[in-house]
């Protein structure tokens, strides 16, 4: 999985957001089936897979750059992914959460240029909020598993919009090819509804 993630990032870095979102959704889906310690172990397994994929990507880039004497294009700051400061990271994370709301706030890469679509996104996001609150208020759940579930739910918008964090430039503009992970915003309620029954 690590090597495949490294290769997919080599093809197009936004695929990292797809993998990240899938991993977080799997963790959300399985959160109630394991105890807290098992959940943390599983989360670290996925985290190490993601970090390994990034490392594989950087290693592959380094090898290709040295052997083929090429340079990376400065495309929206993606070649500065490893040059992150705390300030730029905080700003990027903030932009990622704002980016998650873009389909509601206005036209976003052609997917929400109609008012009806923006209303649909708002309805889906509100439904997710209600389902998360229902799951958190459900009787019988252990406190640590609830906290774990809440943290994962807070990570969903970040994982969907992770491209904002990867491209550390303030001038990053998301375009159509970079929004594959946004599909998972619409799938998220299905994951939560599946566990309701």
Predicted regions and their residues:
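Transmembrane catalytic cores of multi-pass membrane glycosyltransferases
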Residues: 6, 10-178
């Amino acid at each position: 999985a690590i090597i495949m993630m490294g290769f997919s990032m080599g093809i197009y870095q936004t695929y990292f957001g797809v993998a990240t979102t899938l991993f977080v959704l799997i963790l959300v889906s399985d959160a109630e089936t394991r105890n807290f310690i098992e959940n943390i172990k599983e989360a670290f397994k996925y985290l190490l897979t993601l970090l390994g994929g990034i490392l594989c990507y950087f290693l592959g880039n380094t090898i290709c750059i040295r052997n083929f004497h090429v340079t990376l294009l400065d495309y929206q700051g993606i070649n500065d992914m490893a040059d992150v400061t705390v300030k730029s990271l905080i700003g990027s994370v903030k932009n990622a959460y704002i980016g998650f709301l873009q389909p509601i706030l206005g036209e976003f890469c052609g997917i929400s240029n109609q008012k009806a679509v923006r209303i649909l996104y708002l309805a889906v996001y509100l439904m997710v909020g209600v389902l998360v609150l229902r799951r958190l208020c459900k009787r019988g759940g252990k406190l640590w598993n609830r906290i774990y579930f809440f943290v994962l739910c807070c990570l969903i918008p970040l994982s969907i919009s992770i491209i904002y964090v990867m491209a550390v430039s303030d001038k990053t503009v998301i375009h159509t090819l970079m929004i594959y992970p946004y599909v998972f915003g619409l799938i998220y309620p299905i994951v939560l509804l599946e566990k309701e029954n």
